Amino acid sequence: YHACYLGDLVIHSLYPQWEPKFGINGGILPEDVEKLLKDYPKTQAVLITSPTYDGAVSDVKRIAEICHAHGISLIVDEAHGAHLGFCPYFPESALKLGADVVIQSFHKTLPSFTQTAVLHVSKSARVDEDRIRRFLGIYQSSSPSYIFMAAMDRCVEFLKNEGKERFEAFAARLEDFYAFIRGLERIRIPGYEIRGDYGIFDFDRSKILLVPDAHGGEWLAEELRKKDHLELEMAAGGYGLALTSVMDTEEGFERLRKALNRIDGELADEEAACVGRVGAGVESALDRRSRSVGYDGVVHNEIVVSLRGAYDGEKETVPLKESEGRISGEFLYLYPPGIPLLMPGERISRDVLGRVAFFQGEGLSIQGLRDYRAEFIDVLKKGR
């Protein structure tokens, strides 16, 4: 989004599919990419995220073929996939599937310091590598951290010398964990079975999605934090996300297994206690979300003004609850992962406001707005 602002780029959005069973975003359909490129033939590049924060992997190979057939490049945000390609247990890296440029964050899934990342350029990339170098020189610091660079070198050496053995052990621990969770009754954890639908071409099982039959992600995160001293990567409306890596130990997996076993039993007891009560029942966060105002899958926002035009335009502040129909002058998102529910230049819909109300009701923090309480939002003075 910073690049779109700086370059005053025209954005055409590609939306992922919606996986309703577990309440997550799926992948990008190749046919949606094809349609977008036909509708907007002046498109210069396509950017997708794969894998997603939740582990959904799009059909990168087919999407790359479509982009190349139209004479443009494919850029893949593979920030949460730096570990891909080192073991057949995990999906293949986008770089080997035809993507022209791939960005990976070492620190997210490999042993390296925060802020260490790499930009890969394919040998057959349809990009000007010299221009990439030039702009990296403009935007990167002229005083890089030697600690960070040394950490990245150490990470590469680790992968060369110990990678095969470590990743095989990691895959075995994950396989044991997924075998264990088949015995849980009140916590659902998706695996390979979600492949093939909703744009999910493949699935990265190092991302463990925990979907309780009752309560929501914030409740689950609090349970694990207070009673088991385990911290989830993210608490979403209907699920929690546990990220694992090649550095996780058997002891860590065992602690998670014991904690989930305890919670699963408590949820079963809670459900049993409700049986027989008039009008009683345990409603899951997914059920609550499905009946929330305007909540039905992925939100499709209307882009009215360019990102730069909205950022720099004259604005006024209005109550968020009364902003339907106005053009946003701010980002609005949940963090993590920081994917916008709304960005500057988009029209504020009832759908978005319904989601915000649901997330706030689940105890999740809305971020991005100048008003940190998320009660007011800056909108363009002109334009409805």
Model region roles, listed by residue range:
Residues 1-193, 212:
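Conserved PLP-enzyme active-site core in the AAT-like
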Residues 277-281:
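Intrinsic, low-complexity polybasic segments
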Residues 119-121, 210, 244, 379:
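Hydrophobic side chains in beta-strands
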Residues 175-276, 286-368:
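Conserved C-terminal alpha-helix-loop-beta "cap" of PLP-dependent enzymes
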Residues 369-383:
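Terminal helix/beta-alpha structural elements that buttress the NAD(P)+-binding lobe
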